[in-house]
């Protein structure tokens, strides 16, 4: 038997033709185990010195074809999830060439990769396969920096803080070889180890509520190791980002370690604020806060310790211990608070917050590839979260204390998440998957603010789903349905809340050509109230306001539909997107007047709606070092409360000019 990193090479010699012409190269990819045609295989045509020429994916019959190829010497690179990568050398191609059946051998979960000199991207109905070029890997220092080079749609990268986000908001899920990861594990990746990034902008039900999924497919060497650091330090302020990481491989096992430390210490932070209260009796109060320089200080640290075992080519087990911590001894504001209608009515204000949290977790993941293209995945995550918060708010005049608020909150939360997924792939790209996920959490909170309050919350969320993926000619479709059960109970409340929901989801993806497609998606899902909103404890904000939770909040349904059109040609790329959200009985805040106080609370309101549109244009890379992108859009919000109605329109745009040094400059 061959090992994990085996690469199969095949030499094909061509008979020289007598006519110089544009030729075609074609073939059919089959599974070496069962002789079935294999679709969605990435077929990349390169010159013999690894310069990218063209790239396609195999169709339902496992076939591929390259048209209008110049005569010459080439190399084919065949890669697909679950198979060993195969290289085929084509010498002296001068006539139409049919390679016939090409057989791919099954591989382990983490595959060996493809080295491509020209940037390449292959579209699939549910994701994009993005292959970094050799230049992009050479000018990047880690997995986050490489993402900046790729400039994927909607992905926002902050190179200063090594942070990744989504334009327009939403949950971003990061994975490495299919296993959930976090930003610090991506920072620890060496660009040379990254084969490709799978960009899911239409994730299936197995990914939960994720808006976008980024899956880094990386190499797994048989033996050896690596160690590195990534250090950044501000010059004029105490701002630092210090990263240390290492990895050791020995046969079937891999050990990894990464540590991040981020101190912040700023002087001169201030806050300007303006509030207007229109009271039920017809009076209006308008207050303005004029901030003065103050102090902010925090200390972040993250630790990852991982172990993985690939006992066979079809199985993968990984265990990751994560420790997250944030200590914020100072987050202080101070200034003058005055009445707009009478500026002589003013007080001195101090608002100081000290908090910290520690969050250890253990993540266990197991994947087993079975015969006949079947996959089983099990994931278990246990987390403990401990938080402390101390807030002091004071208003004074001429050294006389008018308002003195001292809030202390101590919280403990225990959670356990279990997940099981089964997937069966059929011919012609069809696939069926089932999944079960349950989240159980227990929280205890202690409130000390002149009174002592203790709350206990028990919350559970169960999720069962089934999804089918199919294809009819150029139309790909995905149909899914899930059943959710939400339960919670708060101490002191004899009644518990329990609700069941059925949530359908449908996606239609029509491919016009290799360069453009149109996709429509519609889904129904449920949203649950947060633990903080459910707590009936009152917390005083200032001399005028009180915050109070609502234990009677109910979960609610969310309806969403969106339409996407994408076109790309060479260095030009465009993406046009529109969406509509409708959420009846949405949880939104409301304000009540009780005596001379304003109470901020939450309730299930009439509905919340949102209309969105976005256009993205991108050009690059130019001269192998310059990329330009423009993103512009609009969000129109409509909030219909039980006693109010609000509308708001937000226009936005984002222009980015990104340059990177050439590999030669980087090496110098």
Residue map of PLM features:
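Outer membrane beta-barrel strand-and-loop segments of large Gram-negative receptors
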Residues: 415-417, 457, 550, 554, ...
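Conserved small/polar residues in nucleotide/adenosyl-binding loops
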Residues: 2-11, 658-667
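Structural motif
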Residues: 28-38
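Membrane-proximal, glycine/serine-rich, low-complexity loop/turn segments characteristic
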Residues: 21, 44, 63, 77, ...
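Surface-exposed extracellular loop regions of Gram-negative outer-membrane beta-barrel proteins
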Residues: 211-212, 216-231, 331-335, 433-441, ...
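Outer-membrane beta-barrel translocator domains and adjoining extracellular loop/strand segments
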Residues: 268-284, 330-346, 389-397, 444-452, ...
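Short, acidic Ser/Thr/Gly-rich low-complexity loop/linker segments typical of extracellular
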Residues: 48-63
């Amino acid at each position: 038997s061959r090992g994990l990193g085996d690469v199969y090479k095949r030499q094909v010699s061509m008979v020289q033709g007598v006519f110089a012409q544009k030729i075609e190269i074609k073939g059919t990819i089959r599974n070496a185990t069962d002789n079935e045609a294999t679709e969605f295989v990435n077929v990349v045509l390169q010159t013999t010195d690894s310069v990218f020429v063209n790239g396609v994916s195999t169709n339902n019959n496992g076939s591929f074809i390259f048209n209008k190829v110049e005569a010459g010497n080439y190399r084919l690179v065949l890669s697909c999830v679950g198979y060993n990568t195969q290289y085929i050398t084509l010498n002296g191609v001068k006539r139409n060439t049919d390679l016939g059946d090409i057989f791919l051998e099954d591989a382990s979960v983490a595959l060996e990769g493809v080295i491509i000199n020209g940037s390449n991207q292959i579209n699939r109905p549910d994701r994009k396969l993005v292959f970094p070029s050799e230049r992009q890997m050479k000018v990047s220092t880690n997995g986050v920096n490489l993402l900046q080079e790729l400039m994927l749609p909607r992905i926002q990268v902050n190179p200063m803080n090594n942070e990744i986000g989504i334009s327009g908001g939403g949950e971003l899920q990061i994975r490495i070889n299919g296993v959930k990861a976090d930003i610090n594990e991506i920072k620890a990746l060496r660009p040379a180890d990254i084969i490709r990034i799978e960009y899911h902008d239409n994730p299936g039900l197995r990914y939960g509520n994720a808006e976008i999924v980024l899956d880094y497919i990386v190499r797994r060497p048989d033996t050896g190791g690596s160690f590195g650091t990534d250090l950044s330090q501000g010059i004029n302020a105490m701002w630092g980002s210090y990263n240390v990481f290492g990895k050791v491989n020995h046969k079937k096992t891999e050990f990894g370690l990464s540590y991040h430390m981020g101190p912040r210490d700023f002087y001169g932070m201030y806050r300007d604020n303006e509030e207007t209260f229109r009271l039920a009796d017809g009076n209006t109060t308008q207050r303005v806060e004029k901030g003065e320089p103050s102090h902010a200080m925090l200390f972040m640290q993250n630790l990852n310790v991982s172990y993985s075992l690939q006992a066979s080519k079809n199985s993968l087990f990984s265990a990751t211990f994560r420790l997250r911590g944030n200590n914020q001894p100072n987050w202080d504001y101070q200034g003058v608070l005055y009445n707009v209608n009478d500026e002589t009515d003013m007080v001195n204000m101090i608002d100081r917050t000290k908090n910290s949290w520690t969050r250890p977790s253990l993540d266990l993941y197991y994947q087993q590839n079975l015969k006949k293209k079947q996959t089983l995945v099990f994931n278990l995550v246990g987390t403990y979260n401990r938080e402390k918060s101390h807030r002091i708010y004071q208003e004074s005049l001429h050294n006389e204390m008018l308002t003195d608020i001292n809030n202390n909150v101590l919280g403990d939360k225990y959670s356990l998440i279990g997940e099981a997924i089964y997937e069966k792939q059929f011919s012609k790209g069809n696939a069926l998957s089932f999944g079960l996920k349950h989240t159980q959490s227990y929280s205890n909170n202690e409130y000390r603010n002149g009174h002592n309050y203790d709350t206990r919350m028990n919350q559970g969320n169960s999720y069962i789903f089934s999804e089918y993926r199919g294809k009819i000619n150029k139309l790909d479709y995905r149909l899914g349905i899930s059943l959710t059960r939400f339960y919670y109970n708060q101490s002191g409340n004899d009644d518990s809340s329990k609700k069941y929901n059925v949530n359908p989801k449908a996606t239609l993806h029509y491919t016009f050509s290799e360069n453009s497609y149109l996709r429509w998606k519609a889904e129904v899902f449920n949203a649950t109230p947060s633990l903080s909103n459910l707590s009936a404890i009152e917390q005083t904000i200032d001399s005028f306001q009180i915050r109070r939770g609502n234990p009677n909040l109910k979960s609610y349904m969310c309806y969403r539909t969106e339409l996407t059109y994408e076109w790309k040609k060479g260095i030009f790329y465009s993406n046009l997107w529109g969406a509509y959200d409708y959420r009846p009985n949405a949880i939104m805040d409301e304000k009540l007047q009780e005596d001379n106080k304003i109470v901020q609370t939450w309730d299930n309101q009439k509905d919340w709606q949102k209309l969105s549109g976005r256009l993205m244009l991108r050009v690059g890379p130019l001269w192998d070092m310059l990329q330009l992108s423009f993103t512009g859009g609009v969000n129109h919000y409509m909030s219909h409360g039980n006693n109010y109605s609000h509308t708001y329109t937000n226009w936005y745009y984002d222009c980015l000019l990104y340059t990177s040094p050439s590999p030669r400059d980087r090496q110098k």
